[in-house]
Amino acid sequence: MLIRIIPLLFFLSFIDAQIALPTFQAVHKPHTTTSTLSGTPENPLQSSLSTGLSITQYPYYWTYMMGYIFTPNVNGTITHIGGYFDGTKTTRLWQYSNGNLLASVSVPDPNYSWTYADITDVSVTAGTKYVVATAINGSGAANIRFVSDQLPNTYGNITINYSCYRSGSYDSDTYPSYWTLENRTDYTWGLSDVTFVPDE
């Protein structure tokens, strides 16, 4: 009888260990994979004013599409686009190399103040060039003159490479087939800008 009991006890202890195993594993917490934007938001062109630059307003000039070419120095996200101008205008974000439209939004009348409109978050890559530009439509423009510290300049984690504009009444989500000027270093017009949140 004893010979039969010993194997039975061994078998039961083996089953008990197997049953206990999932209970042991259940105490481990899963890793969180949800990412959130925790970096500090940056507005590169607006922050250029902290270096002593100033804005000049031009209420009745330019029917151009005007903005700047920029390069993030770290990976991150563009969460808003807009700028400093007067009157409701459309601001757009493109990838420079292929002209892909990344965002287009109507910015409510800033009345010559810095105003940014929400867009669907756009992930941007360090070292890749992008363009932000606003259709001025003949009114409410402004410019910044880079007197001694000409472009390219770095503000936070963004390098503004050059200012650019397309002359004529250009207001389209289609990337311009050419820029009238895209390598100006002493002025930027518009004034278009982005809100950039670096990855952390």
Show where each model-derived region lies:
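Sec-dependent N-terminal signal peptides
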Residues: 4-13
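Beta-sheet-rich sandwich/jelly-roll-like modules and their strand-loop junctions
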Residues: 24-97, 135-200
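Solvent-exposed serine/threonine-rich low-complexity stretches and specific carbohydrate-binding patches
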Residues: 100-111
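Solvent-exposed, conformationally flexible loop/turn segments
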Residues: 112-114, 127
